[in-house]
Amino acid sequence: MTLFEAIMLGIVQGLTEFLPISSTAHLKIVPALLGWSDPGAAFTAIIQIGTLAAVLMYFWRDIITIVSAVMKGILKGKPLESNEARMGWMIAAGTIPIVVFGLLFKDQIETTLRSLYWISGALIGLALLLSLAEWNIKKHLSGGRPLKTMEQIGWKEALLIGLAQSIALIPGSSRSGVTITGGLFLNLSRETAARFSFLLSLPAVFAAGIFQLYKTWDIITASPGNIMNLAAATFTSAVVGYLSIAFLLSYLKKHTTTIFIIYRLLAGILLLLLLSTGTLLP
């Protein structure tokens, strides 16, 4: 991998991690289209530390408030006393499913499920689910019922959105896509679903990135070029990811996710056509 390729993949990661279009799919598809080598599951997980940094930078006030409230609640023996403390525990609860499924299906995630056929199916499948979730929101609003805010996320919402996040272990599904979809099915507002999705990503993405960094440390440090490429890709993904978060939260205040549904459908269908004609290999 050249430095240019690493920077380009960092841009792809930053652009697609938070938009509901799947960063893993694009990190697999873009190199295939350009004739580059597959960066692999480890590279993908490690540069997600960059987008993790983007979440930390964007939500640093929220994160400090949540962590502080959780600690105060524990010390006072009232862990759910404040909304901020409750949110901390909701994030923890929502993280449990992806940890369990990630450990159970780690080998399949890193091998079989990285096939472009799986990715094309996931792109199309989640587009259909997201369209159903949008229909649910419109139906809910047409009945004159308000959508839920961050303060109204409880154990049920946290665990179900956490289960939805587990689907993101399938490349092409999109972690933000499945969690936002889950949130919409549970009648969260689009902005609330996205905001909770981003905060929920912190523990899982951090754990996956650190694990892959530890597992591949010898390979990374074997060449200065490897270190430079990973550093460049991670830094780039952090900067671009920050801008992507700001864009999506602003966009969802006034718009639906229709544009992303259409994009996923077109990308999935195009990918299937390229595979069927032999232009791309799975």
Swiss-Prot record:
Listed GO biological process terms: cell wall organization; peptidoglycan biosynthetic process; regulation of cell shape; response to antibiotic
Signal peptide: none
Membrane topology of this protein: Multi-pass membrane protein
Domain of life from the UniProt record: Bacteria
InterPro entries, A to Z: UppP
Reactions the enzyme catalyzes: di-trans,octa-cis-undecaprenyl diphosphate + H2O = di-trans,octa-cis-undecaprenyl phosphate + phosphate + H(+)
Cystine connections: none
Pfam families cross-referenced by the UniProt entry: BacA
Primary location class: membrane
Record's subcellular location: Cell inner membrane
EC number(s) reported in the record: 3.6.1.27
Keyword DNA-binding appears in the UniProt entry: no
Transmembrane residue ranges: 40-60, 85-105, 115-135, 153-173, 193-213, 230-250, 258-278
GO MF assignments: undecaprenyl-diphosphatase activity
Top-tier EC class: hydrolase
Keywords: Antibiotic resistance, Cell inner membrane, Cell membrane, Cell shape, Cell wall biogenesis/degradation, Hydrolase, Membrane, Peptidoglycan synthesis, Transmembrane, Transmembrane helix
Gene Ontology cellular component list: plasma membrane
NCBIfam families: undec_PP_bacA (TIGR00753)
Family of this protein: Belongs to the UppP family.
Any further remark recorded for this protein: Bacitracin is thought to be involved in the inhibition of peptidoglycan synthesis by sequestering undecaprenyl diphosphate, thereby reducing the pool of lipid carrier available.
Biological role: Catalyzes the dephosphorylation of undecaprenyl diphosphate (UPP). Confers resistance to bacitracin.
Protein name per Swiss-Prot or TrEMBL: Undecaprenyl-diphosphatase
Native organism taxonomy: Bacteria, Pseudomonadati, Chlorobiota, Chlorobiia, Chlorobiales
Gene: uppP
